[in-house]
Structures are given as C-alpha cells and as structure tokens.
A protein has these predicted regions:
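Active-site beta->alpha N-cap acidic-glycine motif
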Residues: 30-123, 127-134, 138, 145-146
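Bulky hydrophobic/aromatic packing residues
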Residues: 112, 149, 252-255
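Catalytic domains of cell-wall/extracellular-matrix polysaccharide-remodeling enzymes
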Residues: 72, 94, 118-227, 232-247
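Terminal accessory/targeting
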Residues: 1-58, 75-84, 196-258
C-alpha cells in the first residue's frame, strides 16, 4: 500500500508542476490528427487521401487497469500519438489510480465498466445502480469529472435495465476475441482485415498479447492513413450527440436491446 501511495503522489506532483503529457495532436477544429512525424512516413498517395478524406477509428480497452500491461500500452500509445478509450473496472482501480490520471493527462477517455464486472443483463436493478454508481464515485474522486460513459460487461443489457443508465452506452463493431485467442498476430490480422472508417474496436488491456496486438494494429493502420481517437471524439467528429440509455456500436449505429 505504501508503494501504491508513493507512486500516486509522484504522478500527482508531476501534474501539479504543470508537465503536459497530453500527446495526440489536435486541429484547430478540435479533431485529432496524425502526428507529423508519422505523416512523413506515408507515401504521397496516402497523405493526399488522408487530407481529403480522413479515416477515424477508436480503440477501446476493457477490464483494466492492470499495472504491468496498461503501463506498457500507455507507453506505446504515447510513442505513436494515438488516443484510446479505457472502460475500467472499479475493483481494478485500487493501487492503479496513477494510471487513470495518466490516461486523462495524455488525452485518453476513461469509461465505466462497472465496479466488479457484473453481468447487467441478469442483475437486479438495485445491483445495477450500485455497480455503476460505486465505480462512478471512484472515477469522479480520482479524475474530477462527473460523467463516464458505460460499457456493460459482455456488452449485454436489456431495454428495461437500460432505462436505469444515465449516460450513453458503448458497444463495438469489431471484436477479435483477444481474450480467447491470446495470439497477437491473429488478433492484429482480424482487426486490420475488417476495419473501416468509424469503427470501434474491442480489446482488453489485461493481456500482454492484447497490448502487442494493439500497438501493431496502430502501426499498420496509421500507415494506411487511419487516425486513432477516443470514442467521445469519434462521436463529435461524426456530428452525433449520443443519448443516455442507448447502446451504440458506432456513432451511426445503435444496438437493439432485448
């Protein structure tokens, strides 16, 4: 616990000293863009396509934070100038508070994945409220924000229970089942072969193979002109204001609820 508090104190001190760690570039309009260092590595045809018709996608990570893997992932995102969204589990936050502060400082989005990864589709309504609010309070106390978009565990919730949710809910368009495959190459190929503009990709920052896959996905898709943004940025770029209690697979695609 002492080591946990020391790490937290050091990171807070860095923030108080005003060291700006936010990394993914923004245009005048507030939209994320590929850093110039990466843009320079692309051939002229891809650069031209990117300028005329930019392609935005969102990487999302569930079930963390986990110090050993999430830290490596954040390092890789920082190096590549890529933004991501982390749907965190409240039980995982203890002793990892500094990782959440780092996520926010470096321009990532933090979302709610419930306190203990309960299956909301079958949970009692009081349990659902407790699971979401308990995690919200933890995140609010650490990050100083009020609202955290929700990803229901397993992506499952029904219409009746969705009425309890006071924020947008985020699903995905591509699920390479990284948690099951535990194979970075297969996960990478699944995503790269399926991806298109506006996709939301599901991964987990809990497994080393998933971190390896995520960074390889970024490398390969950035070379094709894709820009990695947070889910919130993706909605803003596409001009969509998400509604509370609605499950979105993408800004222009909602999931029907049972």
């Amino acid at each position: 616990m002492k080591n946990c508090m020391l790490g937290m104190s050091i990171f807070v001190l860095i923030l108080l000293l005003g060291i700006n760690t936010k990394h993914h570039a923004e245009t005048v309009s507030g939209e994320a863009e590929i850093p110039s260092s990466i843009l320079e590595t692309m051939d002229e045809a891809i650069q031209k396509e990117l300028i005329e018709d930019p392609k935005y996608i969102a990487l999302t990570f569930d079930d963390g934070p986990r110090k050993e893997t999430t830290e490596l992932l954040l390092d890789g995102l920082l190096e590549r100038g890529a933004a991501a969204t982390f749907f965190v589990v409240g039980e995982q936050v203890y002793c990892n508070e500094a990782l959440l502060l780092r996520m926010q400082a470096e321009g990532h989005q933090v979302g709610n994945h419930t306190y203990s990864h309960q299956r909301l589709l079958t949970a009692e309504k009081d349990t659902i409220i407790e699971e979401i609010q308990k995690n919200n309070v933890i995140l609010q106390n650490i990050l100083g924000k009020e609202e955290f978009w929700l990803r229901p565990p397993y992506g499952l919730i029904d219409a009746s229970r969705a009425t309890l949710i006071k924020t947008p809910m985020i699903y995905w368009t591509i699920d390479p089942e990284d948690w099951k495959l535990l194979d970075a190459e297969r996960v990478t190929n699944t995503v790269v072969n399926q991806v298109s503009d506006g996709d939301i990709i599901l991964l987990h920052d809990f497994y080393p193979t998933s971190v390896d896959a995520a960074l390889e996905i970024i490398d390969r898709l950035q070379s094709q002109g894709y820009i990695f943004v947070t889910v919130e940025e993706l909605f803003r770029i596409q001009g969509v204001t998400p509604k509370a209690g609605v499950l979105y697979a993408a800004p222009d695609k909602t999931r029907p609820l049972p």
